[in-house]
Amino acid sequence: MNAVGIDVSKGKSMVTILRPFGEIVSSPFEIKHTSSDIHSLIKLIHSIEGESRVVMEHTGRYYEALAHQLSAADLFVSAVNPKLVKDFNNDSLRKIKSDKADSVKIARYALDKWQSLEPYSITDELRAQLKVMNRQFHFYVKQKTAMKNNLIGLIDQTYPNANTYFNSPTRSDGSQKWVDFVSTYWHVDCIRKMSLNAFVEHYQNWCKRKKYAFNKSKAEEIYTKTKELVPVFPKNEITKHIIRQAVDQLNSTSVTVETIRTLMNETASKLPEYSIVMQFKGIGPSLGPRLMAEIGDVTRFTHKGALTAFAGVDPGVNESGSYAQKSVPTSKRGSSNLRKTLFQVMDVLIKTMPQDDPVYQFMDRKRTQGKPYYVYMTAGANKFLRIYYGRVKEYLSVFPDPS
């Protein structure tokens, strides 16, 4: 048995090959992530007598190209959680951190865990692309939130509280009514210079041009409030440029978010479990694809507990002797993006209150018992995943491919 430990980094890796009882087949050596170096590594591993298993840490995206190439060459590859390697066999008082030492440690880990190593599975392109889109979606949502807060901070200097006049949801093209409003009426003097009738007429034409619903009483309310506001910045070209620039940046990011949201739904609809996932209460064309992106192929989980552990919503355990802690926080060792999506699904269930949904009934019962907010929300996420696992896996066993 030959344990190949690979410490992966950007563009290069450190490789060590060991056998039981400390026998060194190959001392640590470096390879580049090029086709020639990877081919040479594959040739070397195949030339060694006995069964060989390759182990590496799944850190970021650096390992995927190497793991994919080695798996395609009919080698046993296992990508393990970096924390498992970090906590493995720390029996030295010396603290050594180098690529060579890490590759040796990974090889020793492979020998010790030989029988329990899980083979690396190549994710199909559709699921991989969906997951990348979901990560990009989360990235741009953060950017959108930052730009929205920036715009609100700016208009507080020219038109305080203008962002609170409308609560219309974001359109499919990324536009929002309050953002379009402050783009046109970027300063209180844009309205105060007009009479009430003139503003109502101007606002009506603006609503018609932007395809928003017009309400005369709303226009009169805005005019009355605006008359009492005190701006900080003067109404000039510099102020106008600052506000319009912030609006353009927010609109651009918002368009990107909605484009990715639509593309994710189109991509997810090609997966076999799409129809059954969309039947869950609390799931829609936005949350459904995001949930499917983070969970991936549910059949790779051996049981329900494996899925809840993957999400990090499994209950913790703290017992010693006669002591047993009753309330233990969840592990939170899994995907933070998945936990966030689950929390949003639970939030939808709490707000819509579907009386026939077992997850909502469970959360409502916990809430009635006086459980804290985060306790019943996390418990609901755990129950949701267990139901998700059962329904989706059963569906895929009957209808594995919609085509």
Please state what every model-predicted region is.
Residues 1-403:
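A detector of single, family-specific signature residues
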